[in-house]
Amino acid sequence: SLCNAFPTLFDAIDESETMELDGVSRHVYWEVVDHCYLCDVCYMTKCPYVPPHEWNVDFPHLMLRAKAVKHSQGKTRTRDRILTSTDLVGTLAGIPVVSSVVNAVNRNKAGRRVLEELLEVHPDAHLPEYHSDTLRRRVDVTRNQDAEAAPEAGPTRGKVALFATCYGNYNEPDLGEDLIAVFEHNDIPVRLADTRRCCGMPKLELGDLPAVAKAKDVNIPQLAALVDRGWDIVAPVPSCVLMFKQELPLMFPDDPDVIKVRDAMFDPFEYLMARHKDGLLKTEFKESLGKV
Protein backbone atom coordinates (compact mmCIF):
# COMPACT_ATOMS: atom_id res chain seq x y z
CA SER A 1 0.00 0.00 0.00
CA LEU A 2 3.06 2.26 0.04
CA CYS A 3 5.18 3.66 -2.77
CA ASN A 4 8.45 2.06 -3.82
CA ALA A 5 10.55 4.37 -1.62
CA PHE A 6 10.27 2.00 1.31
CA PRO A 7 11.13 -1.32 -0.36
CA THR A 8 14.04 0.43 -2.07
CA LEU A 9 15.36 1.68 1.26
CA PHE A 10 14.71 -1.50 3.25
CA ASP A 11 16.18 -3.77 0.56
CA ALA A 12 19.30 -1.61 0.42
CA ILE A 13 19.69 -1.83 4.20
CA ASP A 14 19.24 -5.61 4.15
CA GLU A 15 21.81 -5.98 1.37
CA SER A 16 24.41 -3.67 2.94
CA GLU A 17 27.49 -4.97 4.76
CA THR A 18 26.39 -3.54 8.12
CA MET A 19 22.66 -4.18 7.60
CA GLU A 20 22.18 -0.66 8.94
CA LEU A 21 21.57 2.68 7.24
CA ASP A 22 25.24 3.62 7.49
CA GLY A 23 26.04 0.80 5.09
CA VAL A 24 23.78 2.10 2.32
CA SER A 25 25.39 3.89 -0.63
CA ARG A 26 24.49 7.56 -0.98
CA HIS A 27 23.23 7.07 -4.55
CA VAL A 28 20.50 4.81 -3.13
CA TYR A 29 19.29 7.75 -1.05
CA TRP A 30 18.41 9.59 -4.25
CA GLU A 31 16.61 6.54 -5.59
CA VAL A 32 14.47 6.59 -2.44
CA VAL A 33 13.80 10.31 -2.91
CA ASP A 34 12.79 9.84 -6.54
CA HIS A 35 10.37 7.04 -5.68
CA CYS A 36 8.45 9.21 -3.18
CA TYR A 37 5.63 11.15 -4.82
CA LEU A 38 4.34 12.87 -1.67
CA CYS A 39 1.07 10.93 -1.35
CA ASP A 40 1.27 11.16 2.49
CA VAL A 41 -0.06 7.60 2.96
CA CYS A 42 2.94 6.63 5.10
CA TYR A 43 2.52 9.75 7.23
CA MET A 44 -1.24 9.42 7.61
CA THR A 45 -1.65 5.67 8.11
CA LYS A 46 1.60 3.77 8.67
CA CYS A 47 4.42 5.59 10.41
CA PRO A 48 4.38 5.33 14.25
CA TYR A 49 6.84 8.21 14.68
CA VAL A 50 4.69 11.12 13.50
CA PRO A 51 3.59 13.82 16.00
CA PRO A 52 2.96 13.68 18.90
CA HIS A 53 5.86 11.21 19.00
CA GLU A 54 9.05 12.95 20.11
CA TRP A 55 10.86 11.98 16.89
CA ASN A 56 8.33 14.03 14.88
CA VAL A 57 9.05 12.21 11.60
CA ASP A 58 7.40 13.59 8.46
CA PHE A 59 8.83 11.34 5.76
CA PRO A 60 7.09 12.93 2.73
CA HIS A 61 8.27 16.44 3.59
CA LEU A 62 11.74 15.13 4.37
CA MET A 63 11.78 13.76 0.82
CA LEU A 64 10.46 17.11 -0.43
CA ARG A 65 13.41 18.89 1.17
CA ALA A 66 15.75 16.51 -0.65
CA LYS A 67 13.92 17.10 -3.94
CA ALA A 68 14.24 20.87 -3.43
CA VAL A 69 17.99 20.54 -2.82
CA LYS A 70 18.37 18.42 -5.95
CA HIS A 71 16.39 20.93 -8.03
CA SER A 72 18.34 23.90 -6.67
CA GLN A 73 21.56 22.17 -7.74
CA GLY A 74 20.31 22.02 -11.33
CA LYS A 75 19.97 18.24 -11.33
CA THR A 76 16.36 18.15 -12.56
CA ARG A 77 16.01 16.29 -15.84
CA THR A 78 14.54 18.02 -18.88
CA ARG A 79 11.94 15.26 -19.10
CA ASP A 80 10.67 16.09 -15.61
CA ARG A 81 10.60 19.82 -16.32
CA ILE A 82 8.41 19.15 -19.36
CA LEU A 83 6.05 16.62 -17.78
CA THR A 84 5.44 18.82 -14.73
CA SER A 85 4.55 21.85 -16.86
CA THR A 86 0.99 20.58 -17.06
CA ASP A 87 -0.71 23.86 -17.93
CA LEU A 88 1.79 24.60 -20.72
CA VAL A 89 1.63 21.05 -22.09
CA GLY A 90 -2.17 21.11 -21.85
CA THR A 91 -2.39 24.44 -23.68
CA LEU A 92 -0.20 23.20 -26.53
CA ALA A 93 -1.75 19.73 -26.71
CA GLY A 94 -5.23 21.28 -26.56
CA ILE A 95 -4.84 23.07 -29.89
CA PRO A 96 -7.42 21.37 -32.18
CA VAL A 97 -5.09 19.78 -34.75
CA VAL A 98 -2.31 19.20 -32.22
CA SER A 99 -4.59 17.31 -29.82
CA SER A 100 -5.49 14.80 -32.53
CA VAL A 101 -1.81 14.24 -33.34
CA VAL A 102 -0.82 13.91 -29.67
CA ASN A 103 -3.60 11.40 -28.98
CA ALA A 104 -2.70 9.39 -32.08
CA VAL A 105 0.97 9.24 -31.06
CA ASN A 106 0.04 8.21 -27.52
CA ARG A 107 -2.02 5.30 -28.87
CA ASN A 108 0.54 4.18 -31.45
CA LYS A 109 3.30 1.66 -30.64
CA ALA A 110 5.83 3.45 -32.81
CA GLY A 111 4.89 6.77 -31.25
CA ARG A 112 5.27 5.32 -27.78
CA ARG A 113 8.73 4.06 -28.64
CA VAL A 114 9.66 7.60 -29.65
CA LEU A 115 8.28 8.92 -26.35
CA GLU A 116 10.28 6.31 -24.50
CA GLU A 117 13.44 7.35 -26.33
CA LEU A 118 12.93 11.09 -25.92
CA LEU A 119 11.20 11.41 -22.54
CA GLU A 120 11.73 7.98 -20.93
CA VAL A 121 7.97 7.41 -20.73
CA HIS A 122 7.33 3.68 -20.42
CA PRO A 123 5.50 2.36 -23.52
CA ASP A 124 2.92 0.60 -21.34
CA ALA A 125 2.20 3.61 -19.13
CA HIS A 126 -1.35 4.93 -19.48
CA LEU A 127 -1.40 8.45 -20.90
CA PRO A 128 -4.54 10.59 -20.70
CA GLU A 129 -6.13 11.95 -23.85
CA TYR A 130 -6.06 15.67 -24.57
CA HIS A 131 -9.19 17.56 -25.61
CA SER A 132 -9.30 20.65 -27.77
CA ASP A 133 -12.85 21.15 -26.50
CA THR A 134 -11.64 21.91 -22.98
CA LEU A 135 -13.84 22.51 -19.96
CA ARG A 136 -13.16 26.23 -20.13
CA ARG A 137 -14.36 26.21 -23.75
CA ARG A 138 -17.47 24.21 -22.89
CA VAL A 139 -18.54 26.27 -19.89
CA ASP A 140 -19.24 29.99 -20.16
CA VAL A 141 -16.80 31.66 -17.78
CA THR A 142 -19.34 34.43 -17.10
CA ARG A 143 -22.08 32.04 -15.94
CA ASN A 144 -23.65 32.54 -12.51
CA GLN A 145 -21.29 35.35 -11.53
CA ASP A 146 -24.11 37.15 -9.73
CA ALA A 147 -25.97 34.05 -8.53
CA GLU A 148 -27.72 33.91 -5.18
CA ALA A 149 -26.35 31.28 -2.83
CA ALA A 150 -28.29 28.23 -1.69
CA PRO A 151 -28.86 27.87 2.08
CA GLU A 152 -25.69 27.40 4.10
CA ALA A 153 -24.90 23.96 5.52
CA GLY A 154 -22.08 23.34 7.96
CA PRO A 155 -18.97 25.06 6.59
CA THR A 156 -20.47 25.41 3.09
CA ARG A 157 -21.95 28.74 2.01
CA GLY A 158 -24.09 27.47 -0.84
CA LYS A 159 -22.40 28.60 -4.04
CA VAL A 160 -19.32 27.13 -5.68
CA ALA A 161 -16.48 28.42 -7.83
CA LEU A 162 -14.96 25.46 -9.65
CA PHE A 163 -11.17 25.43 -9.93
CA ALA A 164 -11.01 23.43 -13.15
CA THR A 165 -7.46 21.99 -12.67
CA CYS A 166 -5.17 21.07 -15.56
CA TYR A 167 -6.45 17.49 -15.69
CA GLY A 168 -10.09 18.51 -15.44
CA ASN A 169 -9.71 21.17 -18.11
CA TYR A 170 -7.52 19.48 -20.73
CA ASN A 171 -7.84 15.72 -20.10
CA GLU A 172 -11.25 15.03 -18.55
CA PRO A 173 -13.59 17.95 -19.28
CA ASP A 174 -16.57 15.61 -18.88
CA LEU A 175 -15.62 15.33 -15.21
CA GLY A 176 -16.11 19.05 -14.65
CA GLU A 177 -19.38 19.12 -16.59
CA ASP A 178 -20.73 16.20 -14.57
CA LEU A 179 -19.68 17.86 -11.33
CA ILE A 180 -21.44 21.07 -12.31
CA ALA A 181 -24.58 19.07 -13.16
CA VAL A 182 -24.57 17.35 -9.75
CA PHE A 183 -24.16 20.62 -7.87
CA GLU A 184 -26.82 22.43 -9.87
CA HIS A 185 -29.20 19.48 -9.48
CA ASN A 186 -28.86 20.22 -5.77
CA ASP A 187 -29.64 23.92 -6.32
CA ILE A 188 -26.03 25.01 -5.76
CA PRO A 189 -24.98 27.65 -8.33
CA VAL A 190 -21.59 26.99 -9.93
CA ARG A 191 -19.23 29.25 -11.81
CA LEU A 192 -15.67 28.70 -13.03
CA ALA A 193 -12.82 30.26 -11.12
CA ASP A 194 -11.08 32.88 -13.24
CA THR A 195 -7.58 31.49 -12.85
CA ARG A 196 -6.34 28.83 -15.25
CA ARG A 197 -2.86 28.40 -13.76
CA CYS A 198 -1.77 24.98 -12.46
CA CYS A 199 -2.13 24.57 -8.69
CA GLY A 200 1.61 23.86 -8.46
CA MET A 201 1.52 20.28 -7.18
CA PRO A 202 3.53 18.81 -10.10
CA LYS A 203 6.27 21.38 -9.51
CA LEU A 204 6.14 20.71 -5.77
CA GLU A 205 6.72 17.02 -6.40
CA LEU A 206 9.74 18.05 -8.48
CA GLY A 207 11.12 20.20 -5.67
CA ASP A 208 10.77 23.34 -7.80
CA LEU A 209 9.68 25.61 -4.97
CA PRO A 210 10.18 28.89 -6.90
CA ALA A 211 7.69 27.64 -9.54
CA VAL A 212 5.25 26.75 -6.75
CA ALA A 213 5.54 30.29 -5.39
CA LYS A 214 4.90 31.76 -8.85
CA ALA A 215 1.75 29.64 -9.27
CA LYS A 216 0.61 30.67 -5.81
CA ASP A 217 1.09 34.34 -6.66
CA VAL A 218 -1.26 33.91 -9.64
CA ASN A 219 -3.89 31.64 -8.12
CA ILE A 220 -4.30 32.78 -4.55
CA PRO A 221 -5.27 36.44 -5.16
CA GLN A 222 -7.96 35.40 -7.65
CA LEU A 223 -9.33 32.62 -5.45
CA ALA A 224 -9.23 34.81 -2.34
CA ALA A 225 -11.26 37.46 -4.18
CA LEU A 226 -13.91 34.82 -4.92
CA VAL A 227 -13.98 33.79 -1.27
CA ASP A 228 -14.48 37.44 -0.28
CA ARG A 229 -17.53 37.52 -2.57
CA GLY A 230 -19.08 34.53 -0.83
CA TRP A 231 -17.92 31.67 -3.04
CA ASP A 232 -16.68 28.31 -1.82
CA ILE A 233 -13.91 26.74 -3.92
CA VAL A 234 -14.13 23.15 -5.19
CA ALA A 235 -11.60 21.26 -7.33
CA PRO A 236 -12.31 17.86 -8.93
CA VAL A 237 -8.75 16.51 -8.48
CA PRO A 238 -7.77 15.47 -4.92
CA SER A 239 -4.09 16.42 -5.25
CA CYS A 240 -5.08 19.96 -6.25
CA VAL A 241 -7.35 20.23 -3.21
CA LEU A 242 -4.48 18.97 -1.05
CA MET A 243 -2.20 21.62 -2.51
CA PHE A 244 -4.47 24.45 -1.39
CA LYS A 245 -5.58 22.90 1.90
CA GLN A 246 -2.22 21.60 3.14
CA GLU A 247 0.92 22.28 1.13
CA LEU A 248 0.56 25.99 0.41
CA PRO A 249 -0.47 26.79 4.02
CA LEU A 250 2.63 24.90 5.22
CA MET A 251 4.84 26.85 2.83
CA PHE A 252 3.21 30.26 3.36
CA PRO A 253 1.70 30.19 6.88
CA ASP A 254 1.84 33.98 7.24
CA ASP A 255 -0.06 34.77 4.03
CA PRO A 256 -3.65 35.57 5.08
CA ASP A 257 -5.02 34.95 1.59
CA VAL A 258 -3.50 31.46 1.53
CA ILE A 259 -5.24 30.70 4.82
CA LYS A 260 -8.48 32.21 3.53
CA VAL A 261 -8.43 29.97 0.45
CA ARG A 262 -7.50 26.94 2.57
CA ASP A 263 -10.58 27.42 4.72
CA ALA A 264 -12.88 27.78 1.69
CA MET A 265 -11.44 24.90 -0.38
CA PHE A 266 -13.37 21.61 -0.54
CA ASP A 267 -13.17 18.20 -2.11
CA PRO A 268 -16.43 17.65 -4.04
CA PHE A 269 -17.52 14.72 -1.88
CA GLU A 270 -16.63 16.60 1.30
CA TYR A 271 -18.82 19.46 0.12
CA LEU A 272 -21.77 17.30 -0.84
CA MET A 273 -21.58 15.29 2.39
CA ALA A 274 -21.69 18.50 4.43
CA ARG A 275 -24.87 19.42 2.56
CA HIS A 276 -26.25 15.91 3.06
CA LYS A 277 -25.78 16.10 6.84
CA ASP A 278 -28.13 19.09 6.87
CA GLY A 279 -30.66 17.37 4.62
CA LEU A 280 -29.85 19.52 1.59
CA LEU A 281 -28.65 16.79 -0.78
CA LYS A 282 -31.22 15.32 -3.15
CA THR A 283 -31.02 11.54 -2.89
CA GLU A 284 -34.20 10.57 -4.75
CA PHE A 285 -32.50 8.80 -7.65
CA LYS A 286 -34.52 7.68 -10.66
CA GLU A 287 -32.57 4.44 -10.76
CA SER A 288 -31.10 2.44 -7.89
CA LEU A 289 -27.39 2.80 -7.29
CA GLY A 290 -27.22 -0.93 -6.67
CA LYS A 291 -24.71 -2.34 -4.24
CA VAL A 292 -21.72 -0.09 -3.62
Q: How would you describe each model-predicted region?
A:
Residues 1-3, 36-47, 166, 199, ...:
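Short cysteine clusters
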Residues 11, 41, 90-91:
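Short alpha-helix boundary/capping elements
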Residues 45-53, 246, 250:
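General structural signal for alpha-helix termini and helix-helix connectors
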Residues 2-35, 49-79:
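Non-heme iron-sulfur electron-transfer modules
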Residues 32, 37, 52, 166-170, ...:
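Short, charged/polar micro-motifs that form catalytic or ligand-binding hotspots
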Residues 57-292:
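Iron-sulfur cluster-binding electron-transfer modules in prokaryotic oxidoreductases
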Residues 30-36, 41, 193:
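Processing junctions and N-termini across compartments
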Residues 42, 54, 174:
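Residue-level signal for short amphipathic helical patches enriched in basic/charged
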